[in-house]
Amino acid sequence: MTTRIGVALGDPAGIGPEVVWKALIRRQPDPRITWSIYGPAQFAQSVALSLDPDSEWFDGWKFRLSNGAEGELISVRPDLSITSDLIGRSSALTGTVLYESARLAIKDALEGKIAAVAAAPHTELSVNQAGIEFSGYPSLLSKTAGLSSEVILLLIGGHLKVAH
């Protein structure tokens, strides 16, 4: 049995998509894990192929990276076109996609479709430009799950622990 882990691509205009794919490409794949990548599918696939041209794509948005990691893209807002000219620029369009990608991943986790959610870097400015009140992933998680709005993000790395 495999465990499915969801990853929201973050802001398509930023480093999120590249961070996600490089992390998956460079890690030793675990055959017990499959990945669900949430974001604009065509754009996400183009980033993946630019970093891993030997990856295989089949049955729509399913993939097998050259290192053997497997998963699928979960297409978010296919009505919105993310193009390379948007990279590096905060916009309402990229903010909408960022927000909807993370929200869908959280909903899928709450419904048991995936076991966990990770999210790539985001840009609050982009989401706010879309007219969506957003102060980061922790508040989005609590709002989507119907929890208290008082949340704390805990970052742990090496000997460093930060609560924000």
Model-derived regions, located:
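Ligand-binding "clamshell"
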Residues: Y137, S148-I152
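Ligand-binding beta-strand-loop-alpha-helix segment within the catalytic cores
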Residues: S66, L154-H164
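A generic local secondary-structure boundary/capping motif
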Residues: S142, V151-L155
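N-terminal beta-strand/alpha-helix entry module and adjacent surface
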Residues: I132, S142-A145
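Contiguous, glycine/small-aliphatic-enriched amphipathic segments in soluble metabolic enzymes
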Residues: M1-P138
